[in-house]
């Protein structure tokens, strides 16, 4: 017999009755039923009920066991007594009558229970992550994550992609966030950086004659904590292809992402044919470049109906050309109580309020706005929005660049409050035609809007003749249920265009050469047109596991202060290590 087990804790069935077996695992739960001791033994594969009675030679040993002790149990498989089957367990028709117990690893008093799914403070869960990971839901999430990554690899290979690994130690580059720096012992005063993404390497692979690359890549960014991103590191499905247009990338990646979602959607519908939504259209209709298309509401510009109207607040705003009035339809929301609730919510968001119109029987408009603009304009708005009696509309006004985020929040709030959002689906879409540049108010300069290596639509002509803020890029995102799950673009593969693109953002030619020397040199020796994308593994897993917290799908995450409470990182290091790296600490005063 094997030293530790003949079967796993999830393997025993009716066919094993009367066999002598050996199992090992953790004492998940111990119950004393009037002299009978029941031990639910758990391992990675499942749960098996084990029983000892006072006549069992192992009864005294069984009485000593406590939760999460690791034990080896020998015994005979028998049918559970009639009426005690557990249909929720694959092993639920049988039990082991214990003949021998060996304690392999006792456990101290538990700082958090493994049995059950009670909420515990995050710092306790992270400090004792090895216990937390034993809990069923988190354990299953991690297994699902592994299966999703396997499915990604399988589907990428079916599409003709090859997996390569790019370096982890690289040069620092301005890709939008701070780098994690690694000092060089051999070259004092110089630093490596952990890659924010394999961006340059994957483009260099295309210039090296490879085609259709992918990897499940670790990425590192020294960013301030954010609710939707884990501190420190994350993983992405990184992709690059040679001799492709934007449509080629879409044709290759839609089946991969759709297929992965279908594999793990548990029967929920997944978008088959993805809509392509231009960036500015997405902002106008949904108030965000990450639209949740499960919400059917689309905002409309209704400025013409308020221009010169009796509602002076909006009418005066519209005298400035940049200002607009947007309407958010609220089908079924035409009650005073709901409209007042939305108005109070808006005030809680720091807004002066949320204007509204309700439509009553006969499509008569009601509310302060309707009274001020009159029945003709009110009816025109109703028709434009496709509303009817019992519906409402809500209005935001001003400079869209300033109110668009709030408008998007209001659209989401209306959809949630009126139960219009179908939570049982995965709504995927492409968002396309991103602006190449944006104006950085803090630095008072034009800056890259997204990826600095994207090809501008119009190429070199656009860079030399257009207002930079009007240039669009061959850049695209994949969105799902209000999350950005992937981003990519067709790359700028001409050296003169690369230099010009960076020049507009304030980088001199020599600085470009210094920072991106490897890629700049490669551009001089025959660079193919190429493009690709990167999909966020963590966010995709989060969506498919049905959680809103990235820590629920990650093995050993840091907390929001970028601390690893289990391993004690970041930590001080020995003075000898600092001397070897020629580093002297200059700490801020506390």
UniProtKB/Swiss-Prot annotation:
One of its GO terms (molecular function) is ATP binding. One of its GO terms (cellular component) is cytoplasm. InterPro entries: Aa-tRNA-synt_II (IPR004364), aa-tRNA-synth_II (IPR006195), aa-tRNA-synth_II/BPL/LPL (IPR045864), Asp-tRNA-ligase_1 (IPR004524), Asp-tRNA-ligase_1_N (IPR047089), Asp/Asn-tRNA-synth_IIb (IPR002312), AspRS_core (IPR047090), GAD-like_sf (IPR004115). The keyword Ligase applies. It is found in: Cytoplasm. ATP binds at residues 221-223, 484, 536-539. Residues 199-202 are annotated as: Aspartate. L-aspartate binds at residues 175, 221, 450, 491. Aspartyl-tRNA synthetase with relaxed tRNA specificity since it is able to aspartylate not only its cognate tRNA(Asp) but also tRNA(Asn). Reaction proceeds in two steps: L-aspartate is first activated by ATP to form Asp-AMP and then transferred to the acceptor end of tRNA(Asp/Asn). Belongs to the class-II aminoacyl-tRNA synthetase family. Type 1 subfamily. This is Aspartate--tRNA(Asp/Asn) ligase. The lineage of its organism: Bacteria, Pseudomonadati, Pseudomonadota, Alphaproteobacteria, Hyphomicrobiales.
